[in-house]
């Protein structure tokens, strides 16, 4: 009886102690999660404000102040504007690193093509695609300073859109009815801007929109045209890519002059295949809060193939045939990636430059503050005073 009673008492004491320890650990874990949540919320608010307002406003005002330089030296203007563009990309990389995203590259090493004239065509899965490409290409020569993006015009009238316009990026409208007029404007833009402002790469998503928005219509298009339906991407729209090669493509196999006659032609097509683990594209709002479904979900990948441009691709039918073949290959690459977790070939993990990203935050913060003190605040005060004087 005594032994039994002692054992019961000890068990109860041990049970109480274990329960207390478990409850203490649970409380500590809850506090830790709450602290991390607060840090994520503060960080997300900071980077959203910087990305959506501070950087665009500071960049646009600075570029506007630089415009008079073009009366004296266009190369000097281009040099300074390209430096600003590089710092914009450094900030975007800081956002990627903050949320915990990593990028691994497969296929051809693009370092040797950084200073060439190239057309990069990427599949479009989600809003994070921009971060994947920006982080991947950031450390490769002057690409990040001298690229021209072709972007859907939903962003055009936002501060980001104004900033991208000031750099010379081109916005496209959807719809068949506007196709000819948009492509005509794009051709004019390429002729007037590409060489004048010393661009190097043109980057676009030829599928037209994010995959989940065009997957059904893409399958219908394939079936209607007797093509094999693709599962992981859709056949590209060739209009914009053809416009690039029709204006900037080579006149002959010597690759010495572009078709518009203004300089060195586009020599390479960069076929970029972006992949997310198991095909699940993370939501950008969840990502900003650090809410990843798994550790692997934050590990992005991109596969590069480099194809020399052929002069005959200025014929849209021949270009279409080539691009359709490439997207069949792309579909197979993505199928393998979703199955195995990696693309074929050697891989290289992109290492971000932490010092540059920290400097970018200081740079844009100080630049915005200077513009606010000397331009924005007086303008706001004057506008408000003028408005009140009406009444």
Swiss-Prot record:
The chain crosses the membrane at residues 47-67, 84-104. This is Putative 1-acyl-sn-glycerol-3-phosphate acyltransferase acl-12. SMART domains: PlsC. Its EC number is 2.3.1.51. GO terms for biological process: CDP-diacylglycerol biosynthetic process; IRE1-mediated unfolded protein response; PERK-mediated unfolded protein response; phosphatidylinositol acyl-chain remodeling. It comes from the Eukaryota. The gene is acl-12. The lineage of its organism: Eukaryota, Metazoa, Ecdysozoa, Nematoda, Chromadorea. Pathway: Phospholipid metabolism; CDP-diacylglycerol biosynthesis; CDP-diacylglycerol from sn-glycerol 3-phosphate: step 2/3. A motif (HXXXXD motif) lies at residues 124-129. Keywords: Acyltransferase, Lipid biosynthesis, Lipid metabolism, Membrane, Phospholipid biosynthesis, Phospholipid metabolism, Transferase, Transmembrane, Transmembrane helix.
């Amino acid at each position: 009886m005594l032994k039994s009673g002692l054992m019961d008492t000890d068990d109860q004491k041990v049970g109480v102690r274990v329960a207390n320890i478990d409850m203490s650990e649970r409380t500590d874990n809850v506090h830790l999660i709450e602290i991390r949540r607060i840090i994520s919320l503060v960080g997300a608010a900071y980077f959203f404000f910087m990305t959506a307002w501070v950087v665009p406003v500071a960049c646009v005002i600075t570029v506007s102040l630089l415009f008079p330089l073009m009366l004296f030296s266009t190369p000097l203007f281009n040099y300074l504007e390209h430096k600003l563009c590089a710092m914009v990309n450094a900030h975007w990389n800081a956002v990627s690193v903050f949320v915990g995203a990593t990028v691994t590259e497969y296929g051809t090493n693009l370092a040797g093509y950084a200073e060439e004239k190239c057309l990069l065509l990427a599949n479009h899965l989600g809003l994070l695609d921009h971060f994947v490409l920006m982080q991947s290409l950031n450390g490769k020569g002057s690409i990040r300073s001298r690229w021209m993006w072709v972007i859907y015009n939903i962003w055009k009238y936002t501060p980001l859109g104004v900033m991208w316009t000031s750099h010379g990026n081109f916005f496209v409208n959807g719809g068949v009815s506007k196709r000819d007029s948009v492509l005509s404007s794009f051709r004019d833009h390429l002729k007037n801007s590409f060489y004048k402002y010393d661009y190097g790469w043109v980057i676009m998503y030829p599928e037209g929109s994010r995959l989940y928005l065009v997957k059904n219509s893409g399958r219908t298009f394939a079936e209607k045209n007797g093509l094999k339906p693709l599962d992981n991407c859709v056949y590209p729209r060739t209009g914009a890519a053809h416009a690039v090669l029709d204006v900037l493509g080579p006149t002959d196999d010597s690759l010495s002059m572009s078709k518009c006659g203004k300089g060195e032609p586009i020599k390479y097509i960069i076929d970029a295949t972006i992949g997310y683990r198991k095909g699940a594209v993370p939501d950008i709002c969840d990502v900003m809060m650090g809410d990843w479904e798994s550790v692997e979900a934050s590990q992005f990948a991109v596969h590069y193939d480099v194809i020399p441009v052929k002069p005959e691709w200025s014929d849209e039918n021949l270009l279409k045939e080539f691009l359709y073949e490439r997207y069949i290959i792309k579909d197979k690459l993505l199928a393998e990636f979703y199955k195995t977790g990696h693309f074929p070939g050697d891989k290289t993990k992109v290492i971000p430059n932490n010092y540059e990203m920290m400097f970018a935050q200081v740079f844009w913060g100080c630049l915005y503050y200077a513009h606010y003190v000397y331009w924005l605040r007086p303008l706001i005060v004057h506008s408000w005073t003028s408005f009140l004087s009406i009444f």
